[in-house]
A protein has these predicted regions:
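Conserved mixed alpha/beta catalytic, RNA-binding, or beta-rich assembly cores of soluble enzyme
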Residues: 1-42, 126
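Functionally engaged cysteine thiol sites
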Residues: 6, 87, 95
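Predominant activation on well-ordered alpha-helical scaffold segments within soluble catalytic domains
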Residues: 16, 20, 49, 91-94
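Long, charge-dense
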Residues: 39, 48-90
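C-terminal edge-of-domain segments
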Residues: 91-127
């Protein structure tokens, strides 16, 4: 499961570039991705919606309160993200939350937070 955070107006090409670069660095094929996750305030973000359509994957969004339960498992805590969203790490916590929801098992981060100027990426899986 890929978790994504992004600035308002971040376009699909920026998100796809980050996703592909992070997956390539991790040696993971794009077709192994089963879903995308983010925070609920991004549920209508055009770039995220376009990415989900392009990849033909579901996009599941979680509230900051739901993501807060993953705070202790984050590789990086962003004060900037917290100030804007109430969540210290959208990409990692959303990836963990959805991986656990889909598998009904504990999840772990396969690829920790990767970022560009406009977006963050993380990959989680359940063993």
């Amino acid at each position: 499961v890929v978790g994504l955070g992004c600035q308002r107006g971040c376009d699909v090409h920026t998100l796809l570039g980050l996703l592909d670069a992070a997956l390539a660095d991790g040696g993971i094929e794009r077709q192994r991705i089963t879903a995308l996750a983010s925070i609920d305030r991004k549920h209508a973000e055009p770039g995220l919606l376009a990415l989900a359509r392009l990849l033909e994957l579901p996009l599941q969004c979680f509230s900051a309160a739901q993501l807060a339960g993953y705070e202790q498992r984050l590789s990086h805590k962003s004060a900037v993200a917290f100030a804007h969203t109430g969540c210290y790490g959208i990409a990692e916590s959303a990836a963990l939350a959805l991986a656990e929801q889909l598998s009904q098992r504990p999840a772990r981060l396969l690829i920790t937070r990767k970022k560009t100027a406009q977006a963050t990426f993380a990959l989680a899986c359940a063993d």
